[in-house]
Design a protein with these regions (language model features):
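Short, solvent-exposed secondary-structure boundary motifs
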Residues: 6-12, 26-31, 131-135, 139
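Residues at the C-termini of beta-strands that transition into short coil/loop
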Residues: 23, 30-32, 76, 95, ...
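Metallo-beta-lactamase
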Residues: 45-48, 53-54, 133-135, 141-142, ...
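Short, basic/low-complexity N-terminal boundary segments at the transition from targeting/disordered tails
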Residues: 1-19, 122-129
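Conserved beta-strand hairpin/beta-sheet module of binuclear metal-dependent hydrolase folds
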Residues: 13-64, 171-176
Length: 176
């Protein structure tokens, strides 16, 4: 179980990422002002929700925050949610998302994504210059659908199909 920081912001920095504790054992991970991911730490396992655009090494953040085994899940196929997948050996996603995620796992797609973001006021251009192409790599994908459950020990997160933003969108429901 992670420590709940009692300062007024519950914020810490790890390898350039800013983490804010949003509730006990739930952390929002800001990727250089570009994207937010979530880490939920259970008593037996942890779950990283999305991997960001992949500028920094999100794996090092997860492994600094917990020594528990963990799973990684993408909520949909958009690049700002799957760009760090190459940091991990296996990632879960809705079965409809897998072909798109695999197709965009290349340097050209990454560069096109960065260029498409440059006009956004929150885009951190300096961070994109730090991009490490070595994180574009092979990783196994496991398809999931509604009803799949991530068991973390003291909490279960159930997959709900939530198409809309994309046809392969999912949400995770913690019934506790």
């Amino acid at each position: 179980m992670s420590t709940f920081y009692e300062d007024n912001m519950n914020i810490k920095k790890i390898n350039g990422f800013t983490l804010q504790q949003v509730s006990r054992d739930v952390w929002a991970i800001d990727e250089f002002g570009i994207d937010i991911m979530y880490l939920i730490i259970g008593t037996e396992r942890a779950l990283l929700i999305d991997t960001g655009i992949g500028i920094g090494n999100i794996r090092s953040v997860v492994e600094t925050m917990t020594h528990l085994p963990y799973d990684v899940v993408n909520t949909h196929h958009h690049y700002d949610h799957v760009g760090g997948n190459g940091c991990f050996s296996m990632v879960y996603a809705h079965k409809k998302a897998i072909p798109v995620i695999q197709e965009q796992n290349n340097l050209q797609s990454r560069k096109e994504f960065f260029r498409s973001q440059e006009a956004r006021p929150e885009y951190n251009y300096e961070a994109s210059l730090e991009f490490d192409a070595s994180i574009i790599g092979d990783f196994e994908m496991k398809g999931i659908e509604e009803g799949f459950v991530f068991h973390l020990g003291n909490r279960d997160l159930e997959v709900l199909d939530t198409p809309g933003h994309t046809k392969d969108g999912i949400c995770l429901l913690d019934r506790k």
